[in-house]
Design a protein with these regions (language model features):
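GST-like domain detector, emphasizing the conserved glutathione-binding G-site
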Residues: 2-162, 230
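Generic detection of long, well-ordered alpha-helical segments
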Residues: 44, 87, 106-113, 182-189, ...
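Amphipathic alpha-helical segments that form well-ordered structural scaffolds
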Residues: 49-56, 96, 191-202, 255
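Catalytic cores of nucleic-acid editing and processing enzymes
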Residues: 118, 122, 166-170, 184, ...
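GST-like fold's C-terminal all-alpha helical module
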Residues: 129-248
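Long, positively charged, glycine-interspersed low-complexity recognition regions
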Residues: 229-273
Length: 273
């Protein structure tokens, strides 16, 4: 039996020149032009993670709104461009920028770096699938998102509606193959609550995940993967009602939003210390 040979894109790091004056193209899905755009910048947690990293650490960039991940060099969003050179994957992009523009995590102890790495893994490899579940597998989540983004899939031309249906079917299969869609919704809700309650405990009374004085790349990850749960209740009301009771994570979301996303509104009232 002949195995399918999948294409592989190797990031051309040697072809890209970045310094403090370089304006990087940040290619990402955006929230579009609707009421939700006042509360979230994107529903892609990896895109929000990367955009937050750029904003936190003053990396010059311009946002390029993309409609499909097919334009990405690995068929993934987000990616960056400098001239005609493309670099993909939010984690690899951040790692490369650390080497050429300075590492905001350099002051962390080995134990702090290890903790940040474990938090990142929990969010990117576990909570991410719960996000996908509500965006594509859950009927109520899909209906809400499609109504907000495009006024309902049934109102679109047939060919666009068919493309959206195929995209949803693809992600539904991914969710089932990965395993998250094999759980009941109550079990999925509990998993999400446990993940974010753990982050709340780790933040404690600090301003950021690993300290009070300054953010690190791990704070961009935490914000990217949790902000929509606070800001968009109608998509996952049971989870949102729970996370809004978490005082430390809630204050963190409010801090990052207020400082680095002044154009956004807060959809909740954070607990005061």
């Amino acid at each position: 039996m002949t195995m399918i040979q999948y294409p592989l894109y190797e990031n051309p790091y040697g072809d890209i020149r970045v310094d403090a004056d370089t304006v990087i193209g940040l290619h990402m899905f955006t929230a579009g032009e609707n009421d939700l755009a006042s509360y979230v910048t994107s529903f892609s947690p990896f895109a929000v993670k990367l955009q937050t990293y750029f904003r936190m650490f003053g990396i010059r960039h311009e946002r390029v709104s993309e409609q499909t991940n097919a334009v990405g060099p690995r068929h993934k969003i987000p990616f960056i461009s400098v001239g005609n050179t493309l670099i993909t994957d939010s984690g690899l992009i951040i790692d490369h920028l650390k080497t050429v523009l300075g590492d905001p995590d350099a002051h962390l102890t080995p134990a702090q770096k290890a903790l940040g790495r474990m938090v990142q893994g929990a969010l990117e490899d576990h909570l991410y699938w719960i996000i996908l579940y509500y965006e594509f597998f859950s009927d109520s989540g899909w209906d809400f998102l499609s109504n907000v983004m495009v006024g309902g899939a049934t109102n679109l031309p047939a060919e666009i509606q068919e493309a959206l249906d195929l995209r949803r079917a693809d992600f539904r299969k991914r969710c089932y193959d990965q395993g998250i869609a094999r759980f009941t919704e109550a079990e999925i809700i509990d998993k999400a609550k446990r993940d974010m309650a753990a982050i709340d405990v780790l933040i404690d009374n600090k301003r950021f995940l690993l300290g009070d004085d300054r953010p690190t790349s791990h704070d961009a990850v935490v914000f990217g993967f949790t902000q929509a749960f606070f800001q968009v209740r109608d998509m996952h009301p049971e989870i949102t009602d729970f996370v809004r009771t978490l005082p430390n994570l809630g204050r963190f979301i409010a801090t990052v939003t207020t400082r680095w996303y002044p154009e956004l509104k807060l959809a909740f009232e954070p607990h005061q210390p």
